[in-house]
A protein has these predicted regions:
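Accessory cap/linker subdomain of secreted extracellular hydrolases
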Residues: 3-18, 24, 46-52, 56-59, ...
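Serine-hydrolase catalytic-loop signature spanning alpha/beta hydrolases and amidase-signature enzymes
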Residues: 6-9, 29, 72
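Conserved alpha/beta-hydrolase
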Residues: 19-39
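Gly/Ser-rich "nucleophile elbow"/oxyanion-hole loop immediately N-terminal to the catalytic nucleophile
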Residues: 43-61, 68-85, 90
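Short beta-strand immediately N-terminal to the catalytic nucleophile in serine-hydrolase-like folds
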Residues: 86-88, 113, 221
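Glycine-rich nucleophile elbow surrounding the catalytic serine of serine-hydrolase chemistry
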Residues: 88-98
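Short beta-strand/loop motif that positions the catalytic acidic residue
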Residues: 214, 220-222
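Acidic catalytic loop of the alpha/beta-hydrolase fold
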Residues: 225
Length: 225
């Protein structure tokens, strides 16, 4: 199984892969930082829009990055049998799903688990209302700009109070979170605030229209909350 994720190689350190039987059966595991995250070069783009038509070899998206990774692994990793599986949970589930678009022939099975697919509705807006605490708390740490390669997570945001409700009540207008706390350090926060409606910005980040003629076997895992 091959996991391609934005959370770093140590995001799930308590186990190797989704279950011990995979390791016992002799599977080879590869964990990769996605483009622009942690130790990978390039520019990280949140929910990078898929490009169904490429202008040339330099025109990339997460699907092409996954294709190239699988091509390299199957050509260079000793002992591999030329068959690859992918899985991911939450944001990593998005990367698992993108990998099965125009998939490499070696990709045989994919399991996106609680994956992001249409981010506007999946996480950031519930019944039309902006899900403020979730969005701010996540991006105030995860969304901080990277200054070169690194292995450590960004520090968590310190609210100055254990009462989260009171923190957001006291902050006043949404713009105050930018001017008082984020101060230009989180690009995606500014983009989300600038696009309160389901416009072209969000529609371009909807993965669902691109999940057509998927070749690998797929097991999607989800739940309710």
């Amino acid at each position: 199984p091959y996991s391609c994720a934005p959370y770093g190689a140590d995001a799930y350190p308590n186990s190797l892969g989704p279950s011990a039987p995979f390791a016992a059966a002799g599977y080879i595991f590869a964990i990769q930082d996605v483009r622009g995250a942690f130790m990978s070069d390039g520019e990280f783009v949140d929910m990078r829009p898929h490009k169904p038509v490429k202008a040339g070899p330099a025109d990339i998206d997460e699907s092409t990055d996954t294709f190239d990774t699988i091509a390299w692994l199957t050509a260079n990793l000793p002992g591999n049998n030329g068959r690859v599986g992918m899985y991911g949970v939450s944001y990593p589930g998005f990367y698992a799903a993108t990998g099965m678009i125009d998939a490499h022939p070696a990709l045989r099975a994919v399991s996106p688990q609680a994956p992001i697919a249409d981010w506007f509705f999946d996480d950031f807006h519930h019944h039309g209302a902006f899900f403020l605490p979730h969005t701010f708390n996540f991006f105030a740490s995860f969304g901080l700009a990277r200054d070169g390669r690194k292995t450590a997570w960004n520090p968590g945001f310190r609210h100055g109070t254990p009462d989260g409700y009171q923190f957001f009540l006291d902050i006043g207008p949404l713009a105050n979170l930018e001017t008082q706390h984020l101060k230009g350090q989180v690009a995606f926060w500014r983009e989300a605030a600038a696009h309160p409606n389901y416009d072209d910005f969000w529609q371009a980040r909807d993965l669902l229209p691109h999940l057509k003629q998927v070749a690998p076997a797929v097991l999607t895992v989800g739940g309710g909350s």
